[in-house]
Amino acid sequence: MKVSIRKISEITGFSPATVSNALNHKRGVNAETSEKIFRVAEELGYRMEEKIKKIRFVIFRRNGLIIDDSPFHPAVIEGVEHQAKSMGYETVFCHVDINDAQYQMQIGEILSDTESAVVLLGTEMLEEDFEPFTHAKNKIILLDGWSDRYFFDSVLISNTDSAAKAVEYLAGKGHKDIGYIQGDFRIQAFRYREIGFKRVMERYGLPIRPEYIATVGTRIETAYEGMKRYLDETPVIPTAYFADNDTIAIG
């Protein structure tokens, strides 16, 4: 049943005009009155008409080991900004760092802004990072990230299938010994790409040899250093490798 302003007025004892002004954050309503009206409105399940005025692009940062060097993310950000502009929305960009002392306050402000819709870049998010975002008062779209526990509208890359197609290509070219260069920071996307790698290797009956798996850093410099150490220590190498992402492959 739809909750009306008149119903809130009857329960709180304030006039419908006062209730309407409070719910729309207009001047002239004191803090105590506004707090009481919002409390009753929430208890009754009142939902205001949503008026989104801007897109807030939120870049979640755990350690920067993926997003700082990625050539993929700037293109994604540019695409979101372009599409938002074509629809008449301003795009506001902000970074939230889970290691920042102000992190909780920052996301609290972001998720209580009902005039903005949030596009959350979740590349570096782990499962334990999602819970605070379930309390958002505004709309959220999760980009390049997902939770196994909580529901979010999401836009994702098909990580498992993409990795499988890459390994199928190598197998189709006749490679029997295929190695895997994996990032040492195991974001969700990497774990699902690993599933795709193993799935195709098993399907083709190809061995997954521990000595053919190289674990390296996820930045170009650290990937290079890690791969150099691996090659120095590994006398026999496969004829081809699958890498978790382009940054690691370049390194």
What annotation goes with each model-predicted range?
Residues 115-122, 179-181, 213, 234-248:
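Periplasmic-binding protein-like
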Residues 54-168, 172, 230-232, 236:
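Alpha-helical recognition/docking segments in bacterial nutrient-uptake
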Residues 1-53:
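N-terminal helix-turn-helix DNA-binding module of bacterial transcription factors
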Residues 61-75, 93-102, 155-165, 181-202, ...:
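Hinge/beta->alpha junction and helix N-cap segments in small-molecule ligand-binding domains
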Residues 14, 46, 88-89, 138, ...:
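Short glycine/serine/threonine/alanine-rich loop segments
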